[in-house]
Amino acid sequence: MIAHKKEFYGGGFMMLIFIVIMVIIFSPVFNGKNGLQYMDDLYNCISKGSAYVIPQLKEKANKFMGNNLNLTLVMKDNKQAEESVTLLKNAGAVVDISGSELKVAGDFGKILISALEDADLMYANEGLKVSSKYSYDERQVIYNWWSLFKAIDKDLKKQKKFEESKGISEISKKGLELSYNYYKVEPQKVSDRWGILAFSLIFYVAYTLWYGFSIMFMFEGWGMKLEH
């Protein structure tokens, strides 16, 4: 039984507005995307601009120039091993392949720089240059670099080369992974989109409070109240 009709129907009307707005948010009315997709893309564009650290990573990689390593790497399968040979040879390494296993001798610094140059092109959304360089898909190139670095890191730890392991791990996470994830995302500055960012934060708080008050008024209309 409704004890207070004014509060109950007022809360019900607020809930109806909440639901209507939610339907709009989940509808493809923002350039063919729903509201969540639109905001997710916006935040990705903004975060890409602030996450770019490849020049700093190149400086760290240069410190390993002249550091010659002999590595034994096991790749996922024969196909990935064959594709990875191209990457390593482009970096000046000597590679012997046997199935999915690679025996690599090369300058550690040159290998790191070669991977970072490809990552830099991907970060700038110039994947065509990467694919034409190796004659296969640019995303697969970066994935193969990432897989190579994972295998190299494993072998470096076996050899107790922990400084090199730390360096390649950082470059893999901050260089390769980000260039792969942000590929084809157009970077934007916070200063250029501060209006929509401020609106989204204010809207989120207001929308949440609106929902809370609608529930509260409906329960009060039913005669239910919180008491100390």
Say what each PLM segment does.
Residues 1-40, 197-201:
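Hydrophobic secretory-pathway targeting helix
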Residues 1-9, 191-228:
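Juxtamembrane interface at the cytosolic side of transmembrane helices
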Residues 13-22, 71, 95, 104, ...:
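Generic structural hydrophobic/aromatic packing signal, biased to beta-strands
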Residues 27-55, 188-193:
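Alpha-helical transmembrane signal-anchor/signal-peptide segments
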Residues 57-59:
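Short beta-strand/turn micro-motifs at beta-sheet edges
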Residues 61-170:
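Long, solvent-exposed extracytoplasmic domains/loops
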Residues 157, 161, 169-206:
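Short, aromatic-rich amphipathic segments at membrane interfaces
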